[in-house]
Amino acid sequence: MMNTNELFDQTAVNSSQDKPLNPPFAVAQPANIARGKFRSLTLINWNGFFARTFDFDELVTTLSGGNGAGKSTTMAGFVTALIPDLTLLNFRNTTEAGSTSSSRDKGLYGKLKAGVCYAVLETVNSRAQRIITGVRLQQIAGRDKKVDIRPFSLQNVPMADSVISLFTEQVANKARVLSLNDLKEKFEETAVTFKPYHSITDYHSFMFDLGILPKRLRSSSDRNKFYKLIEASLYGGISSVITKSLRDYLLPENSGVRQAFQDMEAALRENRMTLEAIKVTQSDRDMFKHLITEATQYVSADYMRNANERRGNVVSALAQRRTWYDTKAKLLVEEQRLIEFSREVADINLTEQSLESEYNVANDHLNLVMNALRHQEKIIRYQDEVDALNEKLEQQQIALEEVSEQVEDAQAHTDEIDDRVDGLRSQIADYQQALDAQQTRALQYQQAITALQKAQQLCALPHLDLDNLKDYQTEFEAQAQDITDHVFELEQRLSISDMTKTQFEKAYQLVCKVSGEIDRSQAWSEATQLLATFPDQKMQAAQAVALRQKLADLEQRLHQQQKVQRLIAEFNQQAAKKLTDFTALENHFEQQQIKLEDLEAELANVIELRSVHRQQQEQLTQQYNQLAKTAPAWHTARSVLTRLEEQCAEQFENSQAIMHCMQEMLRKEREATLERDELARTEAALASQISQLSQADGAEDIRLNQLAERLGGVLLSELYDDVSLQDAPYFSALYGEARHAIVVRDLTSVKAQLEKLTDCPNDLYLIEGDPTAFDDTVFSAEELYDSVIVKVSNRQWRYSKFPEVPLFGRAAREKHLITLKTERDDIAEQHAESAFNVQKYQRLHQHLSQFVGTHLNIAFQPDPEMLMQEIALERQEIEGQLNQAVENEHYLRQQADHLKAELQMLNKILPLANTLADETVMERFEECREQLQSAEENELFVRQFGQYLTQLAPIATSLQTDPSKFEQLEHDYQQAKSTQRILQQKVFALSDVMQRRLHFNYSEENQCEGSALTEQLRTDLALAQQEREQARQRLRQAQAQFTQYNQVLISLRSAYDAKYQMLQELMQEIDDLGVRGDSAAEECARLRRDELQQQLSQQRARKGYLDKQLGIIEAEIDNLNRLLRKTERDYQTQRELVVQAKASWCLVQKLSRNSDVEKRLNRRELAYQSAEELRSISDKALGALRTAVADNEYLRDSLRASEDSRKPENKVAFFIAVYQHLRERIRQDIIRTDDPIDAIEQMEIELSRLINELTSREKKLAISAESVANILRKTIQREQNRILQLNQGLQNIAFGQVKGVRLVVNIRDTHSILLNALSDQHEQHKDLFESQKLSFSEALAMLYKRVNPHIELGQRMPQTIGEELLDYRNYLDLEVETLRGADGWMRAESSALSTGEAIGTGMSILLMVVQSWEEESRRMRAKDILPCRLLFLDEAARLDAMSINTLFELCERLDMQLLIAAPENISPEHGTTYKLVRKILANQEYVHVVGLKGFGQQMNKST
């Protein structure tokens, strides 16, 4: 933020920065500074110019040549090196005709050759530094015809090195163009500084700093202005682009003033926003305090209630568990008593269950025996049927085999006859085909040969022929006879073996049924062994019934003995003894009776001690309750005391420390108040000094500005406002007290006005002089080392030393202002801190006073909770002793009950102790059980396999010989028959050959002999067919008989399988029953069942009597069980509550500790209130909170979620949310803490201080409408004077009929009305400028609309319009006028001027712009540098000779360079002229250049 004086100071600074230094005012500018000049332009690898340097004349350089000679290319290279921005470059004379837009390459692509190209400018600045700047250009392949441009610069290049040699190197007899990387490597180790630029802004900044450009081109907008100026210069005429925006070109932007106003408005806006925020904070302070107080009450009350409930639940759970354990102990005692009474019932139940199970077993056994008897009858019946079917099956099998053999014989005989019939048929067919004798003989011969080959093949005799045929036939017939005899023998043996096979198979099957599958060779030995052991097994099976009766008797006796042993073992286990005999048991019984009497006496003493402990417990409880009543007040006092200790950063041990701290706070408050007042005075003094130094014209007294305006003069400080910081001490000492003088043109004219002045300084200095051409020749002065001697007159000298802190000139004032503002900011910060300390000490003293009046008498008492803890420990110790007494009582009672139980058990054991004498019962029982097990196994074996062994005995001898050889015999028989068949075939083949023996010697026979043979064959065929039919009939009969026998066999086999399967199932069932099925077993089982039934009836009668006696005891046990379940259920329920509360409490603790709010919630003073009281506090706070957070959705939702009593952690989350909400809402620039409670405390301290400070600051920041009008008018006046001075340089310009050019600047009528309203009528518009809702810019816009109601502002925002109205350029209209002929001064327009006149007028305007830019940028450039001035002019032939001379004269007078292009030499006697001619040599195009130095210039110099 800044005050009004700071606004004017900033305004003056910025306006003075923008104010150009006119030559008459340039006090510190040396006269011998040479202007920078462009020395040459070098084009490398351009179209027509491989390496060409154009040296520029100091004034005018002319490029002469015909169309296409390269003039435009040369100028394009210059412009490209000057402004390497492809977005701006556009060379018109190479664009497409009739196109609405320029070509893609902007006219640059076609001017370059492939490869690396350079456009380089060589410049010598005012410091005589040689500077080389340029661009590297390179065509980019593609249809877009783009060009890549990279700017660079070279410094410290020796004057002797040519530019071309820098960018090329010689390779043999050719030159190579170097790339940028090559250039960098070339100059890397030399003194030459090579620097490429990646930004056009950096490139232009370099050129501006070294005096190549007249203006710093900071942005693309500045580059656009400069390019438009160059373009207008290049193509000549009056550029509409420039004339329409002359204000942008000639009037500097007074951004400092506008920015100052914007900063001021921002400061005012921020100040007002801060005030509003303070008011909102002040209004919300009570709400914040109310919110945090109610939230603390709401959450802490529930927090402490949950803590108390959790503690109560834990105590209740422990009590429930104690009750549960007590009930369980009582139940154990009652159950122990029940055990003694119920053991007898248990024994009876056990006996009854045993008898009942035995009775059920006996009944089931009887049923099994009867079922087995019925199964045995079925087995016998099915066994007979199976045997009969088996015999029939064997007989049918034998008959079937015989019929099968008959079928096979008939089939073989039929096949043989079929073969013979087929052979006869083939012979007949052959004989019929051979009708003549030769054919018949040949056929017979062939058949004979075939028969011989068949015999050779069949008999395996390859050497068989007619000679040995008879021998072989005889031999094979003998073999056939032998094999026939052998077959007959085998048939006889096979029929005999078939009879023995049936008996062996039956005996073998019986053995397998008894012993399982065994080898056939072992069947005889297995059968012998089974038949040998079978009589003994039958005898042992008969003894099973007697053994069962004996085993039952032994089992009953063994059970009685085991019962006594079990009772003794149980007694020994309970009593931890090892008593086994009757004497030891009797002695132990007497000892236990004596011990029981002693325990009863000790129990009486323990009961008396328990009553004493209970009295002491009641006394301690009363003391504890008394302390609990005083604890809340003590905790409240200690909480307040802790808060005070944190605020005071001290520890209070007693009440004297509190009183001492109060006195200390009073002392600190007085000291801080004195310091605050002193800093306020220092800050005010610095602000006043800054305000004086911030005046726009350097006047220490604001009245001087009004006087200067009234007297029509200018303040001397304003004339010297641009003096440098180095010259400031000299001029300050030179003028002394007169440095605040007013410079007027005529003192005599001012003298009359002096007498009328009423409000002016005591000493007013007036100096006569021209304000537009004032210098320091008023005084005769002599400068010494650090002082100056001023000769006021011949008799009066003034000696003045240079001031240590000069204040003459804007630069000196700005430097001192920086120091003063820094000091003022430090003082302001210290003042704010002191004011805060004053408020803090006041608040601390107030809090201490309240504490003394409320809590001092109780805060330093001993901690009640510590005393309560001591009492609790003592009470806990007494409770432990009381519990110990109760436990001792319970233990003694248990011991007594235990002794009683032991005595009761001994009463049951002693009558039965004599049964322990018999020690052989167990051995006899095991022996009898083993005998019975063996007898039952034999009985089962006999029952299952006795019938099989009975059938096996008669035929067992057949197992001695194995009929399996029958199969081998049958195999030999089949093999012999096969051999017989083969031999018969061989014999038949040899017989056939023997019959055809004559055919081998066959000769021709007559026809009748062939016919007789055919008839013989047909007769044989008919006989063979008849025999074949008979054989087939016999085969069909045999097959029908075989089918019939086979069906009978299948039916017999199915019946056998069904009967046998049923037999096996019955045998399996009787095996599963495991009993013997005979009449003796049935009678024995029936007797056993009746006996057990009688015993069971006696036991049940006894049991009914005992159950009536146990009813009372069981009812008591049930009552105790119900009580135990109830207490256990209550304990589990209470424990679940504790566990759930613990989980929730842990989450609450975690949230509160992680968020550092536990100390806020753990209010110990609330721990002593009841749950209803705490709930009431929480409910009241909840109602208040609902109203407080009704407008905050987040807090409202959090509060609603916290109302769930099942989740207390939500309340802590709500408290944390409130903390976070307050932490975010409280201004961190005002409050110096993150804790909302501490922030509210600091807010109380800070609010009043900030309100006073910001209110006073707003008064300082208030912007005066009259001051704004004065600033705008002064700025407008200064710029008007500058434009008038620029017009002086255009007085002698003449082009054709144009005899003069000037700039006319006027104030717009609407804006003039606005200025008048601001300065003279500001009282009428207070409603705008004093409104808190409008900024100054908005108020200014509203005033503009009010005083100009006829103007339509459109939809623009008032803020935007107001910002434009703060720019003085919008108040001015700037036009160019020309003096032409009889028309006088008229507005310069191209339509009213000839081409030459327009070119000259446009050039004059451009010169004014360039000069204006130089003056505007003078303060941003070094003082020893004057920038280069160069303009272009293409097609200059349109100017006449007088206009050309005018241009040359203008260039000479303004020290400017001009580059002209024309088809002809327009003025060869002036400047330097280059003749350009484009030629083609050896298919290479190049531009021939001839330079001519102006001879007229040389003659003038010589003369």
Curated annotation (Swiss-Prot):
InterPro entries on file: MukB, MukB/SMC, MukB_hinge, MukB_hinge_sf, MukB_N_dom, P-loop_NTPase
Pfam families per record: MukB, MukB_hinge, SbcC_Walker_B
Binding annotation for ATP: 65-72
Entry-linked Gene3D superfamilies: 1.20.58.850, 3.40.1140.10, Immunoglobulin FC, subunit C (1.20.5.420), MukB, hinge domain (3.30.70.3500)
Subcellular location: Cytoplasm, Nucleoid
Alphabetical UniProt keywords: ATP-binding, Cell cycle, Cell division, Chromosome partition, Coiled coil, Cytoplasm, DNA condensation, DNA-binding, Nucleotide-binding
Cystine crosslinks: none
Span list, region Flexible hinge: 696-813
Molecular function terms from GO: ATP binding; DNA binding
Keyword ATP-binding tagged: yes
Domain of life the protein comes from: Bacteria
One GO-annotated biological process of the protein: chromosome segregation
Start-end of Polar residues biased regions: 1-19
Coiled-coil regions listed in the entry: 370-495, 536-616, 662-697, 865-1173, 1238-1293
One term under GO cellular component: cytoplasm
Region of interest (Disordered), ranges: 1-21
NCBIfam families, alphabetized: PRK04863.1
Domain-related comment: The hinge domain, which separates the large intramolecular coiled coil regions, allows the homodimerization, forming a V-shaped homodimer.
Quaternary structure and partners: Homodimerization via its hinge domain. Binds to DNA via its C-terminal region. Interacts, and probably forms a ternary complex, with MukE and MukF via its C-terminal region. The complex formation is stimulated by calcium or magnesium. Interacts with tubulin-related protein FtsZ.
Similarity comment text for this entry: Belongs to the SMC family. MukB subfamily.
Function description: Plays a central role in chromosome condensation, segregation and cell cycle progression. Functions as a homodimer, which is essential for chromosome partition. Involved in negative DNA supercoiling in vivo, and by this means organize and compact chromosomes. May achieve or facilitate chromosome segregation by condensation DNA from both sides of a centrally located replisome during cell division.
Protein name according to UniProt: Chromosome partition protein MukB
